[in-house]
Structures are given as structure tokens and as C-alpha cells.
Amino acid sequence: MKHAIRHIHFVGLGGAGMSGIAEVLFNLGYRISGSDLVDSATLRRLQGLGIGTCLGHAGAHIEGADAVVTSTAVTADNPEVLAARAKKIPVVPRALMLAELMRLKQGIAIAGTHGKTTTTSLVTSVLAEAGLDPTFVIGGRLNSVGAHAKLGSGDYIVVEADESDASFLNLLPVMAVVTNIDADHMETYGHDFGRLKGAFVDFLHRMPFYGTAILCVDSPAVRDIMPGVTCPITSYGLSEDAQVRAVDLRADGARMHFTVQRSNGVTLPDLAVQLNLAGAHNVLNALSAIAVAVELNIPDAAVLRALAGFKGVGRRFQSYGQLPAKDGGQFSVIDDYGHHPVEMAATLAAARGAFPGRRLVLAFQPHRYSRTRDCFEDFVRVMGSADAVLLTEVYAAGEAPVVAADGRSLARALRVAGRVEPVFVADVADLPQAIAENARDGDLLLCMGAGSIGAVPGKLLEMLRNDEHTAMQRTAP
């Protein structure tokens, strides 16, 4: 070809979705380079693979590139985008590049407001356990592989489908899961919930006539759209009319036990499932993977092994173990990406079920002023269900501040509600010290948020273990 694409440059390479696509393309034989504003473990890992990376954005970084891929966060006035436009180098949105990848395989796309990353990981793990060696691109690090993505030799590619900017409408899967639909990223849809639901219908209709929609009927909004979906549907959930249904749920520490009943056309034997994840919300995520397995005729034994041995996803109820408390005891630390009230409520319930009787301490960094404004009362209600709360300022994610939708306003409203007395920590950099001062023996600390709070558990661990080491040195004879 006259304009063959050999060198692809990624602007915003450190993002979870971007890094995954870049890694798969690199393994397909393309030359990959990329830039990001800040250094990260993701960038360093890609460097180790042989991918060229740059810190900061400059027009010179795209030298030699045949195409430039951008994330949603990259603006039109980015110097690398401007340089590409000036040189007539194609500028490709991330979702379009993901769609190109999906053309090489049979695509299974996981959509929904919550649970996409965990569900994508579970589906990937089930296919891998069955020997299907899928390609995958996930928004989190799959712990069993240690990466966000992998190029497999099999026929399937499993991807997250992002509704936040409506970019999932670029994808052409042969099977699609919708985990739930809630009001989030409403600015994309003109603050019209009907438009959001309509976008999910349009997404499902991107499948070919032989495609299958795997839909969670426990979500009222998903149930609402079902009459308008013209492709074949397999429903799942805890509801009595679900075709793939879980009953007899039981928590066992950070694991869930349940029985699956399957009656999609043909009634299959019940499955006694052990899931290596906590919470009823993760039972729903596992049910979607089981429904996919039914469609692909994956043996039950492979499904059961995959779910029982699932090693989790980075920042999804991720345990950091026990850390020393100021009073001489120990407290447990769990890190979670959840940042919407629905996600937070599910994770808090999972924590209560997995660790009954423990004092639950929530450390939360709100994500985006617009979400804080739109979900303000729900945030106050959910945070009030914890036993203690440490709250930081909002992680802006590029947004301008919104009056009365900041961290201090949330803390004030939480205090007025009277359920809990919050500790407000303006700078997230001071959060590890604030946690150390407030944690007690036996506490369960849950760090939640999609912003820079993700670095807090690691910094807390380093700080407390260094303090412990120093104390031991002082008391040594």
C-alpha cells in the first residue's frame, strides 16, 4: 500500500485503555511510540517491552509516525495533535483504533455503567481456562497476566465498551454484555437519561444479525430497553425471570458461593459456583461470564475453575494486607476504583459481608466536579453508611470547579446528616498520614476513587513499614 501504517504514536499512552491497545498492536508487529504528562508504572512496563515513551507533549514526538491515536482526555489543541494535523498524519480516536483491532477477531464487548473491568476480566479468564486463548483489552490490570492487554492466538477478542463519550458506538462485536445502566457521564447525552438508554440500544444493534445480547435484568434501565432490542437476548441476574440466575448466595470471607440455574431455551444442570471475589455485585458480573460461556458451549468444568481461581483485577477490591496501627494493633487495607455512589454502595456492602463486625473506615476522593454535583445527595447517603470517613478534595479530571460541589461541601453535608464525623484532608498527599493517625486495631480501611488516590495504599504501606522499621531499630539493644 502506498500509505501503509507501520509506526503508530499514542498521545496519552499511560491510560489503561490506550496502553492496552498499544501493547496488542506492538505484539502484532507495529512500531509503537507514545507520550504522557506523567510517569507511571504502565509507561515503565511498556518501555521494558521496547515501546518508546516520552514525558510531556511536544510536536517533535510524532516524528516518523504514520498515525496518531488519541484518548478522550486529549484536546484538539494538544501540540502533538496539531503537529499531526499540519503534516496530514491521520489522528485516530482510541475507540476507532479499538474497532480496527476487533475486525481481526470475533469481538465480545462488555458495556455498562459499572462493573465493565471486572466483567471483561472474568469473561477473559473463562475463555482462557477453556483453552481459547483470547486477545483482550481491559481497563484494569488482570492480575493473572500482570497486564491490561494480551494478544492471543484464538478467535476471540474481549474488550471494554466505553459509554462515557459514546465511543462504544464505534464497535462491531458479535456478542455484547450490558451489566447495568445508571446516570453517569450525562453531559455526553445532554443530561437526558432516555438518550443514554437509546445509545445502549444503538450499541447492541451494531452487532450482526447472528449476534447475542447478554443483558442484566436486575438493572431497571436495562430491563427498560429490552423491548427495543431486536437481536437475540440472554438475560441474567438474581431476578426470578432471568435465564441465567443465581440463587442461594453466601459470603465466605472475600469469596462468594452460589448456585446457578440456566434455562435459555434448553434447561442445563445447576452449577454450584465458588467465586474468588466478594459481594453480590460480583456474583452478577460472574453470571454474565457464565452466560457468555453458555453461548460459546464452554464446558462447565472450565467455567468453575476460572471463577474459583480468579486472581482479580488491579484496584478492584484489591487487598494490601495488614498494616500496623498507631495503637499497636493492625488494620486491613482494601483499594477500589469505585467512584459512583452505586459502585461505592456495592463495594461497602461487599466489605461488610466479607469482614463482618469490623469498623469500616472509608477514605474517598471524589472524581469530577460534575459527578459530585449530579450525585451529591447519593454520595452523602452512601458515605454515611461507613463507620468513619476521610474525605479529600475532588479530583478534577480536567474540569473547572463547580460551586458547592467540592470536597469541603461534601464533608459539611455529611457532618450535618449526623451519621458520621468526616475528616477532611484537602491535599491527597496528606491522606496517608491522616489514615495512620485515625486507623485503629481491627479496622478495615477502604480506599476508593478513580483519581490520584490510587497511589495512597502503596504510599501508606511504605510509610508505615518504614516507621515500624525505624521503631524496631530504636528499641534494638
UniProtKB/Swiss-Prot annotation:
- Keyword set, alphabetical order: ATP-binding, Cell cycle, Cell division, Cell shape, Cell wall biogenesis/degradation, Cytoplasm, Ligase, Nucleotide-binding, Peptidoglycan synthesis
The protein's location, in the record's own words, is:
Cytoplasm
Pfam families recorded: Mur_ligase, Mur_ligase_C, Mur_ligase_M
Give EC number(s), comma-separated: 6.3.2.8
Q: Which InterPro entries match?
A: Mur-like_cat_sf, Mur_ligase_C, Mur_ligase_C_dom_sf, Mur_ligase_cen, Mur_ligase_N, MurCDEF_pg_biosynth, UDP-N-AcMur_Ala_ligase_MurC
Taxonomically, the superkingdom here is Bacteria
Q: What's one GO-annotated cellular component? A: cytoplasm
Q: Which of the seven top EC classes does this enzyme belong to?
A: ligase
Q: Provide the reaction this enzyme catalyses.
A: UDP-N-acetyl-alpha-D-muramate + L-alanine + ATP = UDP-N-acetyl-alpha-D-muramoyl-L-alanine + ADP + phosphate + H(+)
Its function?
A: Cell wall formation.
In Swiss-Prot or TrEMBL terms, this protein is called UDP-N-acetylmuramate--L-alanine ligase
Which species? Verminephrobacter eiseniae (strain EF01-2)
